[in-house]
Amino acid sequence: MDKLILRHGAALKSKYGTAGLARIDAALRALVTADRRRGIDTLVLSVDEAAAMKAQGLAPVARTDAKSLKAAIDGLAGKLAPHYFLLLGAQDVLPLVPLVNPAYTGDDGDADKTVPSDLPYACEAPYSTDPARFQGPSRVVGRLPDPPGASKPDLLLQLIRAAARAEPLPREQFHTFFGLSAAQWQASTRLSLRNLFGQAEQLKLAPSQGPRWSKAELAPRVHFINCHGGDTSPEYLGQHGDDYPVAHRASLLRGRISAGTVIAAECCYGAQLYDPKDAGGHLGIALSYLADGATGFFGSTTIAYGPSEGNGSADLICQYFLQRVLAGASLGRAALEARQRFAGERTHLDPVDLKTLAQFYLLGDPSLQPVGFASHALAKTRAFKAAFAKVQDRGVRGLRRERLEREGLNLGRSLPRLRDSQQAPAASVEKVLRAMAKESGLDIRQVRRRSYVLQAAKQGPKVPARSIHMLKGRRTNGQLITLVATEQGGELLHVRRLHARGG
């Protein structure tokens, strides 16, 4: 089994009626046929239908039950071992898992009590709302969304049909980029773009640019965006001091996006799926991109973080995703490899990095390969083509999945877990942190602290007694600032400052 498309017939029928569901199923049959031509064996499975799930030895999934969906995916992974899981629909069709936000500090700080996430579906660990249990992703998972609350299936049909038509494009068509940044964060964004493309000359800054971008400006097939985003908002904002102008607007994308475009957005709520009725009838930016021909969107469901200079958290996971896409990976493999690299490069995941791992997810068919890669000379011979004509990439893909599964399992077994702690920092550490908070423009009387300890994984290395302290506060312009410090033996080992990408 190469690809498993999970649909919830009852939820789709409730949204779109019997006729709408029939149209969706017809489009899915066409996608299965297109996948077969691409060498991908695809099965569409109705997770709510008792007979279909009984045939797999599993219980059906209730409509809004993330726990049941997680159990079903775990069972299907064990029995069918698909190379790709495609979740069909938004969270009102197939739910996201409401993970507890490890960086939550109350309504005046990081107000996200939960982090809606697809990460648990990519992990072998059983259902939980503790994000620390999902530090070892090993499965390729993506979501082809529809608008929450929709009553007509037109957009979902459009996205399914676009996935059926999609083909890899030459690497040369991805040499240029559309880069957009809040002016306040341009140093960080320029570094990200140099890491991806070797230069950042085309970077657009808000203010004073945007949001009325021309078709030529939006034509590049890679978009990298580092702006402010907001809950249930169809806009991204720039920033310079206290000025927060609109930098990107969903309604202005129509007719301007090149087919096959791939986007990574660091913004808070950058890939949030919401009912358009809650935003004046406007789709979010992520869905608007897909509706206009983009192939994949990698972004966050909640408040995200990164530094104003240098790279960290959202900067890194977005870079890693695009690097793998540009190297010829499928969208889903790029997302999985980005998650694994992000988690694997760290001794431990602090509360902000743990939230980052949980909140970024893929919108798009995970099996699609946007960028074609150059074949080795042997692959061009007649003997090679004859030998692999019926399986194409399947054998090599299976080897890659073995490696990725091993990497994920090793991460899950070895990374220490974050646990809440009531222990205050050592006096010398607290003094330094308070001074840093003050120099960061925060009113120390309004700063909130949350502390943690690290718990060694059962099969991981021993972890010295080590504490993590997170301080959050807002500047006079309302911007949320976070200091994350690592303490060991009363000594300050490491500290970093992060800015919320909106919120």
Cite the ranges covered by each PLM segment.
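Catalytic cores of nucleophile-dependent amide-cleaving enzymes
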Residues: A111-L156, N226, D231-I317
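Structured catalytic cores of large enzymes
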Residues: I5-R23, A34-R36, D41, A52-Q199
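A short, surface-exposed interaction/processing loop segment used at functional sites
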Residues: G478-G503
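Exposed beta-strand-loop-beta-strand "reactive/processing" segments of non-cytosolic proteins
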Residues: V447-E487
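Active-site-proximal C-terminal subdomain of hydrolase catalytic domains
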Residues: A51, D92, E266-V391
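Catalytic-core segments of thiol-dependent peptidases
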Residues: A72-P95, E167-P168, Q173-D278, L283
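Short, non-transmembrane alpha-helical segments in secretory-pathway proteins
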Residues: L418-A456
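Extracellular pro-sequences of secreted precursors
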Residues: M1-R37, L69, R401, E405-N410, ...
